[in-house]
């Protein structure tokens, strides 16, 4: 699906009509983009009540025949997900329904960058960033929030590390010298290094690493610029984001996040992961057909630091 797009670029129009079938696929992605103004499709939802020959008796008969899950999809027009999703689907659906009402005051890079609110004087802002590992299905992403949890800007796209660092610094300066927390694992270290050493940006978030050494009763500590993700703190920040979304303590406007949230599930070990991510082929190589969690991780980091939690503590092995 989508192979017709190059043909349409030379002229013509397209009407795509379907009942929702799953999430994260091409149709669902285009729908979410359309209601947020991110593409040229005009989203129209046609309800069964609009049909002149349908009444409540027809609906009840169909509901009995199809069952609740298929009724929701085929009759009510709801996108359904599979697996135990991390985020409350009622909350995510409410966010999706609000996308068409979101005001976007600036876009760049074909919609990869979206700004919703200008910086307000005297307001503290926070930027958390997830840095792409370079794999085909991996993106760099960031989110800008104020202390109250209102998201004022977001980005998700393919971008070299030096340009990503420049983009983060640009919006750090623009948003009142915001605290920037780039994930500093692996290739993310290059982004953090550029921010610190090339751009001389000083308002960086720091992680504290506790070094336990043999023969010493008192551990040593080391402050590391950027956000250092571990399996433990990853679960903590995702759990906090889930709770804040469920309790309406954070206002997310990012359509990329909503696309990812529908396919962000608990795996067999109860670990929150993007559906199909890190799945390995029979040959042992990582497959590139899974879904993404880049916007989710950027949001989780930003949400954590905007609460005034200025340092994350990591205990290093002996």
Regions found by a protein language model. Give the residues of each.
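Signature of the SF2 helicase/ATPase Hel1-core->accessory helical subdomain module
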Residues: 1-50
């Amino acid at each position: 699906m989508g192979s017709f797009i190059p043909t349409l670029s030379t002229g013509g129009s397209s009407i795509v009509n379907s009942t929702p079938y799953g999430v994260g696929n091409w149709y669902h992605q285009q729908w979410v983009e359309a209601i947020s103004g991110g593409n040229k499709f005009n989203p129209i939802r046609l309800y069964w009540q609009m049909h002149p020959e349908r009444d409540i008796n027809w609906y009840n008969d169909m509901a009995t025949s199809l069952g609740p899950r298929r009724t929701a999809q085929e009759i009510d027009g709801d996108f359904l997900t599979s697996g135990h999703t991390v985020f409350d689907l009622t909350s995510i659906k409410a966010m999706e329904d609000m996308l068409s009402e979101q005001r976007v005051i600036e876009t760049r890079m074909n919609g990869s960058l979206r700004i919703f609110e200008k910086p307000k004087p005297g307001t503290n802002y926070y930027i958390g960033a997830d840095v792409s590992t370079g794999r085909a299905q991996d993106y760099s992403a960031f989110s800008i929030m104020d202390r109250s949890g209102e998201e004022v800007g977001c980005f998700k796209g393919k971008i070299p590390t030096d340009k990503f660092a420049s983009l983060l610094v640009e919006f750090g300066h623009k948003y009142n010298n915001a605290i920037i927390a780039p994930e500093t694992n692996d290739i993310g270290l290059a982004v953090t290094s550029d921010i610190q050493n090339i751009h001389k940006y000083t308002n960086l978030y720091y992680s504290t690493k506790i070094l336990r050494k043999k023969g010493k009763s008192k551990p040593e500590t080391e402050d590391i610029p950027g956000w250092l993700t571990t399996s433990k703190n990853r679960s903590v920040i995702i759990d906090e984001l889930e709770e804040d979304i469920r309790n309406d303590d954070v206002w997310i406007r990012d359509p990329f996040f909503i696309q990812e949230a529908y396919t962000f599930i608990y795996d067999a070990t109860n670990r929150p992961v993007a559906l199909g991510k890190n799945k390995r082929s029979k040959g042992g190589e990582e497959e590139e057909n899974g879904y993404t969690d880049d916007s989710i991780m950027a949001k989780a980091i930003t949400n954590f630091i905007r609460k005034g939690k200025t340092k994350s503590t990591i205990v290093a092995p002996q």
